[in-house]
Amino acid sequence: MGRVRTKTVKRASKALIERYYPKLTLDFQTNKRLCDEIATIQSKRLRNKIAGYTTHLMKRIQKGPVRGISFKLQEEERERKDQYVPEVSALDLSRSNGVLNVDNQTSDLVKSLGLKLPLSVINVSAQRDRRYRKRN
């Protein structure tokens, strides 16, 4: 069973990441030295705990966004994703021989919206191929 981290350690780590994200790495020793240079931390033990939790959060950030932490690079990436517009529309009938291939749910949605599009309903299997299954 692991140890519980205090609120002080968590707050300090989040503040470090938000301010100094580009300088931090996935290496504990590097983060420890950076904590020493940047912040005035009372004890060596507290500094090590903060550096360790910072390293842990950096590893989580590599996998995806972490709740409670926002830094400039993450905000820019989120903004870019929100502003994304595909080059070719999925509703472009000239590319698909005048008929859109959709599943049952999409067909019902299009009908409920009152759009008059030529649709071809295709059955979609709920089971994915083994090769593409996510591994935990």
Swiss-Prot record:
GO BP: cytoplasmic translation; ribosomal small subunit assembly
UniProt keyword list: Cytoplasm, Ribonucleoprotein, Ribosomal protein
InterPro entries the UniProt entry points to: Ribosomal_eS17, Ribosomal_eS17_CS, Ribosomal_eS17_sf
Record localization: Cytoplasm
Other comment: Present with 30500 molecules/cell in log phase SD medium.
Assembly and interaction partners: Component of the small ribosomal subunit (SSU). Mature yeast ribosomes consist of a small (40S) and a large (60S) subunit. The 40S small subunit contains 1 molecule of ribosomal RNA (18S rRNA) and 33 different proteins (encoded by 57 genes). The large 60S subunit contains 3 rRNA molecules (25S, 5.8S and 5S rRNA) and 46 different proteins (encoded by 81 genes).
Record's function text: Component of the ribosome, a large ribonucleoprotein complex responsible for the synthesis of proteins in the cell. The small ribosomal subunit (SSU) binds messenger RNAs (mRNAs) and translates the encoded message by selecting cognate aminoacyl-transfer RNA (tRNA) molecules. The large subunit (LSU) contains the ribosomal catalytic site termed the peptidyl transferase center (PTC), which catalyzes the formation of peptide bonds, thereby polymerizing the amino acids delivered by tRNAs into a polypeptide chain.
Name of the protein this chain belongs to: Small ribosomal subunit protein eS17B
Cellular component, GO, one term: cytosolic small ribosomal subunit
Organism (species): Saccharomyces cerevisiae (strain ATCC 204508 / S288c)
Family assignment from sequence similarity: Belongs to the eukaryotic ribosomal protein eS17 family.
GO terms of molecular function: structural constituent of ribosome
Main location: cytoplasm
